[in-house]
Amino acid sequence: MQAGHEGAGREQSFGVNIHLPFEQQANRFIRNDPKLVAFHFFFTRKLIFVKEADAFVFFPGGFGTQDEAAEVLTLLQTGKTQMVPILMLDLPNNGYWREWDDFVRRRMLGAGYISEEDLSLFKMVENVEEAVKEIQHFYSNYQSLRFVKRDMVVRLVHPPTPSLIAELNRDFRDILTGGEIRETAALPEEADEQAAWSLHRLLVPFNRRNFGRLRNMIDVINGPR
């Protein structure tokens, strides 16, 4: 968390700490700041940092790192939080996340505990520059989504072309509940989000189940790197 605070600067940062009888102290970039919040329970701390984050970059760590990574992946897998990029950043010649990825594929996927599409919820990266490019690409066109009644509204920076809409309807029909993906104006139910009012939109009859496939769809919406 210190790296995030250092990069953003104190004015643009907030901290979510945990009360422990040992080890845990706020880093010097956020220490004594009124935007530093200390929690008694890990689950409330995770709830807050997941709610406010636009991306997650996980570095090698201990049980806490594994706990947070599993929490975020589970929330995305089940649609309980906004779709965001999740990146596993390995240190040079370390292989920490490569070994984790191998375990996930052999033990979880191999035993049928997760689906093939769930592997799309995270990406492996080798350095900071690669992580930055992945995050920038994720938001190069896609911005956010919102469920309105039975449909999902996907907000975009650029207007969707007819060829893109046709491609999405062809390649992602397996996650549609009926009807087709189409362009739409902002819906009345979105009036409480004025900051997103001017964005372009797709109306998607998403089945609310295959969130790994939804992550694949976002990659297509953003186009080639």
Where are these regions (language model features)?
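Active-site/ligand-binding-proximal alpha/beta "capping" segment
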Residues: A38-L87, Q143
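Short gly/pro/ser/thr-enriched loop/turn and capping motifs at secondary-structure boundaries
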Residues: L20-Q25, T65, N93-W97
